[in-house]
Amino acid sequence: MSRVIALLVACLLLASCSSFPRPGGAPPSDGLTAQAIFDRSLAAHGGDLRRHPGDINLSTDGRWYALIQRIQPVVTDAGFRIRSEERYRPSEGLYAVRHTGPDGTKHVVRSTAGLRVAYNGTETDDDEKRAATAMTNDAFRMFHFGPTFFLDRMASLERLPDAREDGRRFHRLLATLRPGFGRAEQDRAVLWIDAGTARLYRIHQTIDGFPTTVGAHVDTTFLEYRAVGPYLLPVRFLERVRGPLRIKAHEWRVTGIDLDRGWRAADVIDPHGFGGAAARPATPIAP
């Protein structure tokens, strides 16, 4: 079976190699700067989440495609990362995620003090798992909470030529991120922003924070949004590998959202589960 998988991957690599977008070509002569387009998108999503004094709580559910699990088993961690409960306090930089899957629970806490990772209630010091988790945790905070993610690490921003898809026009911005995702010193991301609504439609990113993903790039399309209090948050996603091969990787949706429960940091750091005001699942949203 392993030989079959290796042969399949080799064929895909030869047939589907794709490079990450680079600067080039004249941007539209509409007078809009990259920063102006980004600022408009940030405002369309409700502004800078770091100014929100309370908490944001999500539930998610999804599935990983079979081939990506075989190619990147440590990164996908699909035995644990199927559903999640997420607790985010952006003003403090505290992001806690409790994943569940057929193999049990994975509890991840990212804070200004660092990263903690536990499986089935036991904290791990496995460096490979921690490195992969650092990268995916950063990426999913970007997916779920939008333009605010870029404010802390955007070293440069430039405009690429616009693109059209399904009859819609999208501004494209190339951002250089320092640091990158997880342990990467640098990554790049192309933001596709709807020229009409200013919503983020897609993020195309490099993922250099883990040895087996260096040189690869993926895109994630935001297929649906919901208004939650003053914010506009994406709730349905499709992630695809774009290079060095082209395959679907992951699709998921947000199944619950609520704001401002008033939980404490102590309520989300226990690897055995969330407690206090963080304990109950996020309030369900209609599919």
Language-model regions, residue ranges each:
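Gly/Pro-enriched, hydrophobic low-complexity segments
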Residues: D166-I269
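C-terminal motif of bacterial Sec signal peptides marking the signal peptidase cleavage site
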Residues: L13-S16
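Short solvent-exposed loop/turn micro-motifs enriched in small/polar/acidic residues
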Residues: G79, G101, A155, A184-Q186, ...
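Sec-dependent signal peptide recognition
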Residues: S2-A10
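Flexible, processing/modification-adjacent segments and terminal tails
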Residues: S29-L32, A36, S111-D187, I207-V214, ...
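N-terminal mature ectodomain segment of secretory-pathway/periplasmic proteins
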Residues: S29, Q35-T124, S156-E158
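Short structured motifs
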Residues: G24, A44, S156-P161, D219-F222
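Bacterial signal peptide processing site
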Residues: S18-P21
